[in-house]
């Protein structure tokens, strides 16, 4: 099983993805670790990435599913804000990917981002991310979940939406 936990900064991607990987007995990866230094510096300076900046990174995210091997479920925390970004990830992956889209109100997102001290993404880029965000479309394999509830409840909702073990969905 290959899963991307997606959403804007502050939605809880890393926290939920880590808990989901633990619940499934799988591997957790954070797509932020796959950004190159130039992209990190650009975002830290408050400059939104362009599609050209994102393309190689999204390819690395898709390839990460393959390089994680056969370790069981692989869960990656990744913004994957637009449909075309998700399509780029799918194109590089060797198996179908389930997307768990996290949503939360802007005020709570901003509060969470402001409270972080160890992240390169400034609150100033939240509006840009919200403008860029495209919800999952009807033909995309996944689920949308609010992160207003506890991490345990959010993970439970995602697990409920996953297919039974051994079934494969195509996207």
Region locations from a protein language model:
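Walker A (P-loop) ATP-phosphate-binding motif of ABC ATPase nucleotide-binding domains
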Residues: 2
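Hydrophobic anchor at the beta1->P-loop junction of P-loop NTPases
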Residues: 5
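P-loop (Walker A) phosphate-binding loop of NTP-binding proteins
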Residues: 8
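Conserved lysine of the Walker
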Residues: 13
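Conserved substrate/cofactor phosphate-moiety recognition/catalytic segment
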Residues: 18-60
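Glycine-rich phosphate-binding loop used to anchor ATP phosphates in small-molecule kinases
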Residues: 52-95
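ATP-dependent NMP and nucleoside kinases share a basic, alpha-helical "lid"
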Residues: 79-117
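Small-molecule kinase domains that catalyze NTP-dependent phosphoryl transfer to phosphate-bearing small molecules
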Residues: 115-157
């Amino acid at each position: 099983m290959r899963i991307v936990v997606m959403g804007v900064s502050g939605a809880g991607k890393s926290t939920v993805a880590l808990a989901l990987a633990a619940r499934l007995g799988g591997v957790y990866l954070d797509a932020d670790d796959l950004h190159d230094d130039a992209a990190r510096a650009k975002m830290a300076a408050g400059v939104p990435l362009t599609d050209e900046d994102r393309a190689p990174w999204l390819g690395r995210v898709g390839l990460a599913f393959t390089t994680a091997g056969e370790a069981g479920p692989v869960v990656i925390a990744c913004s994957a804000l637009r449909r075309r970004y998700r399509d780029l990830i799918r194109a590089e992956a060797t198996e179908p990917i389930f997307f768990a889209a996290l949503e939360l109100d802007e005020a709570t997102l901003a509060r969470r981002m402001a409270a972080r001290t160890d992240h390169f993404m400034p609150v100033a880029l939240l509006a840009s991310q919200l403008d860029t965000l495209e919800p999952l479309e009807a033909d995309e394999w996944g689920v949308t979940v609010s992160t207003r509830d506890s991490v345990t409840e959010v993970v439970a909702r995602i697990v409920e939406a996953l297919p039974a073990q051994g079934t494969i969905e195509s996207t």
